[in-house]
Structure formats: C-alpha cells, structure tokens
Swiss-Prot record:
UniProt keyword annotations, A-Z: 2Fe-2S, Amino-acid biosynthesis, Branched-chain amino acid biosynthesis, Iron, Iron-sulfur, Lyase, Magnesium, Metal-binding
GO biological processes: isoleucine biosynthetic process; L-valine biosynthetic process
GO MF annotation, one: 2 iron, 2 sulfur cluster binding
Organism: Streptococcus thermophilus (strain ATCC BAA-250 / LMG 18311)
Name of the protein this chain belongs to: Dihydroxy-acid dehydratase
Disulfide bonds: none
Catalytic residues identified in the record: 479 (proton acceptor)
Length: 572
C-alpha cells in the first residue's frame, strides 16, 4: 500500500496522484518549478492563455495570466501557467493562413486538454482573446469536466478618425470603396493607421465578442466580464477574480456539466439573436454542445430566431461598438431586460455557484435613454438575424445573417468560383453586377481545408455599394464582421459531393429568408448528369490541414473533429 507523505486535501481530486512515496521523482521536478512542502498540500490550478505578440486580440494575455495566478494564490491554491496557440483571423483573412483559423479551434481544445490532463491539475482558468480561442477553450472545458472558468481578454477600444469611431471592418470596407473610386489610397491608409488603437478583440458584435457573450450567458465566465474592455480596470479585476472563483468552484464541487445544460445553450442562442451576433455562433455552439453531451441542432436556432427580436444597434450592421454596450450597462443589463420579459432561464446555476437571476441582482438596468439596445416594442428587427436555410442547394442546412439587409429574397444567376481569390478578382474587375449570386465553393471544413472566412470578399462587395444587391453564398464561413446578403456553412460541402459542387455559372439560385429556403433551379436529370461527369478533387493530405480534412465533420454538426460514424472498414 502506497504511503501518502502529503496531507490530505479534499480539493486535490487529481493532483493527489503526486502525493505518495513512489511519486518522489515527480515531486523532485516540481520542486524545481518552485513548489515546496507547503504548496504540495494545495490543489493545483492551471492558468492557460492564448497569448501571442502577433495580434492585438492576444498581446496582453500573458500579463492577464499573471493576474489570474494572483487570484488563485489568494484563494489558497497553487497556480501553474501554461500557453497554447492562437491564429489571428483579421491578420490571416484573405490569405492562405485563413485555412488554419477554424483548425486552430480544435488544436486549442486538444492542447488545453492535453496540458491540463497531462499535468493532473485540479481546476483551470482559460484566458482567450481572438475568435477561435473562446470555443476552443470551451470544448476543452466541456470535455474535461473539471472545475474551470473562461476569462475573456476584453474588447478593443474603437479607433477614431475625424471624430468618428472606426474599427477593423472599416478598413476592409475601405478597400471596396477605394476600388469603386469612392476613397483614395491615402484615406484607406488613414483608416489603417487609426482602426486598432490597442489590445483587445475586434470591437463590434463580431465573433470574439459574440462568443465571449455566449459563454457569460451560459454561466462559464464571471457575470459582466464579457463586456469589460481590454484596457479597463474592471477587466483586470475580473481576470483576478476568475482565479479566486475557480478555486471556489473546486470547493463547491461545481463542474462544467452542472452548468452547461440544454437551458444554458438556449439562453446563449437567445442573447446571440438579440444582440445580432456572428454566424460563427451556430458552428461553435454546436461544437461546444457536442463536447458537453447536450442535444443541439441547427433547427434549434430557427426556433429561437422566430421568437427573439434583434435589439442591438451594434456593428457590423449597426452604428455602435461593443464598448458602447459596456457604457450603457453591458451584457448583464441586456440579460436583466430579457429575463424580466421571459426570454431567459433565471434558475440555472452558473460558475459563481449562484443562479442567473441571483447574479443579475447585483447589476443595474440599461442606462435610461441609451440608444444601443432598442426596446422590445420597437426592435431593430422583429425576429432574429441568424436564419437556418434549407433546400436542394443545402439539404443539411446553411446559415444566413440578414441584419441590416433590406432585401428579403433574391433570385439571380450564379457566378461560381472555386476559390475566394478568383471571386475577389472578379469583384475588383467589376465582373459582378447587381442581381448576381456569387458562389464560392470547395472551401468547406474538408475542402478548404479549414472553412476559411470571406470577410475580404464580403467587405469589398459592401464597400462597392452592392451589399443589398448581390448575394454571396459559400460552403465556407463569414467573419462576424460580415453583413449584407450572405449565406455560409452550406452543407453538405462541395468537397464531399454536396449539391453546391454541381452548380454552374448561369444557373438561377433563390435565397428566401421568409420561407427559409435556398434553391438551385436545376432539373434533377441535369443534376444527375453533372454528378456523373464531375470528378471531385482529392482531400488535402499533408500536415495538420491534412489531418483536419480527413476527420472534421460537416458544418451542420459544428465542424468537430471527434465525431465518427464508423463503417466496417473503420473509415470515417
């Protein structure tokens, strides 16, 4: 029988593996990191961040990790800091590097699970700043199911040019305006030099802020934390408090599976609809739900789309940035408003150990007279802005974001491209005319590989004044900064022989947000003929993208990498 030479601590559920006499060699290495007899008696709490110097979203996160460690120490546990990767979407956008963006979500999840599991931590805090950091962290948190909290690095402050707030999307759209002759190269350079004034995630209701909000709503980050700006005193305080709070979770025996219930995901979808969040929320919430063993489907999003109005006048389709929401009460004030009106489940438990309703009691209502959140009686849109479409072009579904779009349906000729680069060249060469349906395919999860975003392309179309006149369809994704008549996540994707693979330039296509249909007007006989004539390209086969292409699921299932439906050959 092994002799424990470290005193018993009922919070050391996992790190107690180091306590016995035969683990003396393990402790010898840990002593070299600063651990002592005293610290061996404490639970070990990991603090893992996606710090990197290459992007404002993450450049400040190493320091935030140090702050979180202080909170862990203050609560009586032993903190250990780790790092994992990030891919900056705004920097990778429109380049071959964009194929690594969604791929990085699952690498982040796997690396967190490997590091936390490999070192037997009792609990952990995950700190993220850019788009895929949030769902990557949450997939790991759900899979590990040990006490954990996510802490968001915070939103960037808006840039300012000539007295007007601007952000990164202003620069992307500036390229379209420059190409159209509405802006000079010098004016675009002025946008470039003033759009990003410091650290923080992209400033509108884009993917980073959408997912940070969703995680707070679900109860896996501290109340109010998602809307605290990156450079605010409140942000530093909530990062430190996250360290203390995760130790409290450990004391209470509170696990992610207690928090990540079906009702938690319903509330996340509700607030995403009300705030006009990113299309990527569908993909990421499906993936997190899969990790949490919660039954969630694309069809569920339409259920909430039909009954939750769009209230927030936030970018990309509105005029305000996320910091403006913070200034009028932040996410808790929005949640209080929705809870009072029967849209949320107030009795759910959260990472504080309190219910949603109990947490919200500590926060003020929306600032009287504010303009960021519109009243339920006069919403920005009567229903939600994220719509799941189905039809013979997308039998498994597709995701449309229709906030700010005046046109409710369009039927037009397809202009089909097998890469974003070719589509961009066509836009810049004025080959795309009003009424066209631009289609970019073979860029899905397997085909990209990595399901790249099309912000460069969509922003150019908007910048040229065609945002309401040209539809853009893809089996890839759109940035949270995208708006206009756009449909992404078309499934099945072209790479696996989805109908989009057989669409040809000139075919008529209908997108209808009222009937939630997406249709290619091609007779079945002609479609069968095209299938017989078409040879699909081989899957990418090298390196991490090759691995990803071979194991990733359909976008309709969240593009997850641990969903297998094995046949007799053992092939996925």
């Amino acid at each position: 029988m092994e002799e424990n030479i470290v005193s018993e601590n009922n919070m050391k559920h996992r790190s107690s593996v180091y306590d016995s006499m035969v683990k003396s060699p393990n402790r010898a290495m840990l002593r070299a990191t600063g651990m002592t007899d005293d610290s061996f008696e404490k639970p070990i709490v990991g603090v893992i961040s996606t710090w990197a110097e290459n992007t404002p979203c993450n450049i400040h996160l190493h320091g935030f990790g140090q702050i979180a460690k202080e909170g862990v120490k203050d609560a009586g546990a032993w903190p250990v800091q780790f790092g994992t990767i990030t891919v900056a979407d705004g920097i990778a956008m429109g380049t071959p590097g964009m194929r690594f963006s969604l791929t990085s979500r699952d690498i982040i999840a796997d690396s967190i699970e490997a590091a936390m599991g490999g070192h037997n931590v009792d609990a952990f805090v995950a700190i993220g700043g850019c788009d895929k950091n949030m769902p990557g962290s949450m997939i790991a948190i759900a899979n590990m199911d040990i006490p954990a909290i996510f802490a968001y690095g915070g939103t960037i402050a808006p840039g300012n040019l000539n007295g007007k707030d601007i952000d990164l999307v202003s620069v992307f759209e500036g390229i379209g305006k420059w190409n159209h002759g509405d802006m000079t190269a010098e004016e675009v350079k002025n946008l470039e030099c003033n759009a990003c004034p410091g650290p923080g995630g992209c400033g509108g209701m884009y993917t980073a802020n959408t997912m940070a909000t969703a995680i707070e709503v679900m109860g896996m980050s501290l109340p109010g934390s998602s809307s605290h700006p990156a450079e605010s005193a409140e942000k530093k305080a909530d990062i430190e408090e996250a360290g203390r709070a995760v130790v409290k979770m450990l004391e209470m025996g509170l696990k992610p599976s207690d928090i990540l219930t079906r009702e938690a995901f319903e509330d996340a979808i509700t607030v995403t609809m009300a705030l006009g969040g990113s299309t990527n929320a569908t993909l990421h919430l499906l993936a997190i739900a899969h990790a949490a063993n919660v039954d969630l489907t694309l069809e569920d999003f339409n259920d909430f789309q039909e009954r939750v109005p769009h209230l927030a006048d936030l970018k990309p389709s509105g005029q305000y940035v996320f910091q403006d929401l913070y200034n009028v009460g932040g996410v808790p004030a929005v949640m209080k408003y929705l809870l009072k009106n029967g849209f949320l489940h107030g009795d759910r438990i959260t990472c504080t150990g309190k219910t949603v309703a109990e947490n919200l009691e500590a926060f003020d209502d929306l600032t009287p007279g504010q303009k960021v959140i519109m009243p339920l009686e006069n919403p920005k849109r009567a229903d939600g802005p994220l719509i799941i479409l189905k039809g013979n072009l997308a039998p498994e579904g597709a995701v449309a974001k229709v906030s700010g779009v005046k046109v409710r349906n369009i039927t037009g000729p397809a202009k089909v491209f097998d890469s974003e680069e070719d589509a961009i060249e066509a836009v810049l060469s004025d080959e795309i005319v009003d009424g066209d349906v631009v289609v970019v395919r073979f860029v899905g999860p397997k085909g990209g590989p990595g399901m790249p975003e099309m912000l460069s392309l969509s922003s150019m179309i908007v910048g040229k004044g065609q945002g309401d006149k040209v539809a853009l369809l893809t089996d890839g994704r759109f940035s949270g900064g995208t708006y206009g008549l756009v449909v992404g996540h078309i499934a099945p994707e072209a790479q696996v022989g989805g109908p989009i693979a057989y669409l040809r330039t000139g075919d008529m296509v209908t997108v209808d947000q009222d009937t939630k249909e997406i249709t290619m007007h091609v007779p079945d006989e002609e479609l069968a003929k095209r299938k017989a004539e078409t040879e699909l390209p081989p899957l990418y086969s090298r390196g991490v993208l090759g691995k990803y292409a071979h194991i990733v699921s359909s976008a309709s299932r969240g593009a997850v990498t641990d969903f297998w439906n094995m046949d007799k050959s053992g092939k996925a």
